[in-house]
């Protein structure tokens, strides 16, 4: 981890990170984080009864447990704004909302109706304007006019699906779905594949998302703010997430180890100089501290900070290159999966930029109308 941050610091005057995803590999020493969190979330409907430590409340926006038989969101109401009458309701026509109408539940309903949650994304995706049923086309070919075509409504406790078809082309379906959600206090309960099954999600107020899988391996999607400047801000954001995450784990699974790790993490946060932060991270790796010793890069992207003011020559790119050009003027390096990968493609990027500058200078110095075709081919295609 420290070597990665050291290199990102070396190039931060030229490149900035965008997407940054990583994993924390499961360790036997820390116990069944997934199982204990699942048990707590499944049995409670108040945020305070899941997250006891009020010091970390401002950092955590929502907890989500997803399985085929139960999808449950627990929201922290205090992290949401007070809505006025003109606040846009995003999702009423997709959901049948059942609530006990208490003050707490009514506030959760208000938030749910206005937040673009994963449930909204899920139901929008499953509502298909048109879908071809190829099985029914086959029936038509082999069965003639007596083939049966389905249209109508089918439903279970949580999902109602309406299928409509045109009499002239009955194998082309229009599908609409409505999902039932039960809202009790801070909980939003339904069923279905609205996220990755058998996962727990912790959504932070800074938009970072932590996904915990059944074996307690974690996938962390680190958010990016416009005001993030350089590697030191990135370290602070990552370790801020660590600090609150580990205190949450200590809260739920009652393992003092996480409180100790949170204290070590806090030393990184309070250090003011980058060199000091990197020294502490290296020390954590040496002592096999959770969060550093089991850190594994998932994928990250870099963007070249400056716009390219010279001609771009796509012919210089390999077919499977991770270097991409956005609108011809923004250079991105995508899907980097290791420090070695990063160093390799940054080096290629730097060399390519220099080659493009040289070719651009030559191209600008010649008369395209009178120059030979072979000469232009050499410049543009090789």
From Swiss-Prot:
<dbReference type="InterPro" id="IPR008789">
    <property type="entry name" value="Poxvirus_intermed-TF"/>
</dbReference>
<keyword id="KW-0010">Activator</keyword>
<comment type="similarity">
    <text>Belongs to the orthopoxvirus OPG150 family.</text>
</comment>
<keyword id="KW-0804">Transcription</keyword>
<comment type="subunit">
    <text>Heterodimerizes with protein A8 to form the virus intermediate transcription factor (VITF)-3.</text>
</comment>
<keyword id="KW-0597">Phosphoprotein</keyword>
<protein>
    <recommendedName>
        <fullName>Intermediate transcription factor 3 large subunit</fullName>
    </recommendedName>
</protein>
<keyword id="KW-0805">Transcription regulation</keyword>
<dbReference type="Pfam" id="PF05718">
    <property type="entry name" value="Pox_int_trans"/>
</dbReference>
<comment type="function">
    <text>Acts with RNA polymerase to initiate transcription from intermediate gene promoters.</text>
</comment>
<keyword id="KW-0244">Early protein</keyword>
């Amino acid at each position: 981890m420290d070597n990665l941050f050291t290199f990102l610091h070396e190039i931060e005057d030229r490149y900035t990170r965008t997407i940054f995803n990583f994993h924390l590999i499961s360790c036997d020493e820390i116990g069944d984080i997934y199982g204990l969190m699942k048990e707590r979330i499944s049995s409670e409907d108040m945020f305070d009864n899941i997250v006891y430590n009020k010091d970390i409340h401002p950092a955590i926006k929502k907890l989500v447990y997803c399985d085929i038989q139960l999808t449950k969101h627990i929201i922290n109401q205090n992290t949401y704004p007070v809505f006025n009458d003109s606040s846009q309701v995003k999702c009423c026509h997709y959901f049948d909302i059942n609530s006990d109408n208490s003050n707490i539940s009514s506030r959760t309903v208000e938030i749910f109706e206005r937040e673009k949650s994963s449930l909204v994304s899920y139901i929008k995706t499953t509502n298909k304007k048109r879908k071809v049923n190829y099985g029914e086309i086959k029936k038509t070919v082999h069965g003639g006019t007596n083939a049966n075509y389905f249209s109508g409504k089918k439903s279970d406790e949580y999902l109602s699906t309406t299928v409509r078809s045109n009499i002239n082309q009955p194998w082309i379906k229009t599908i609409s779905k409505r999902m039932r959600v039960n809202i009790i206090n801070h909980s939003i309960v339904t069923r279905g594949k609205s996220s990755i099954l058998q996962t727990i999600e912790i959504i932070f107020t800074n938009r970072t998302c932590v996904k915990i899988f059944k074996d307690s391996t974690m996938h962390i999607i680190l958010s990016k703010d416009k005001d993030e400047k350089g590697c030191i801000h990135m370290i602070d954001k990552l370790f801020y997430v660590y600090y609150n995450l580990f205190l949450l784990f200590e809260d739920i699974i009652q393992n003092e180890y996480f409180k100790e790790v949170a204290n070590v993490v806090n030393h990184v946060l309070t250090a003011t100089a980058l060199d000091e932060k990197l020294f502490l991270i290296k020390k954590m790796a040496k002592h096999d501290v959770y969060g550093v010793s089991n850190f594994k890069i998932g994928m990250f992207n870099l963007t070249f900070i400056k716009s390219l003011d010279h001609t771009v020559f796509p012919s210089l790119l390999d077919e499977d290159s991770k270097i991409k050009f956005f609108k011809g003027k923004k250079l991105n390096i995508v899907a980097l999966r290791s420090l070695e990968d990063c160093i390799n493609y940054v080096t290629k990027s730097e060399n390519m930029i220099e080659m493009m500058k040289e070719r651009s200078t030559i191209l600008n110095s010649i008369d395209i109308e009178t120059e030979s075709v072979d000469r232009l081919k050499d410049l543009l295609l090789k």
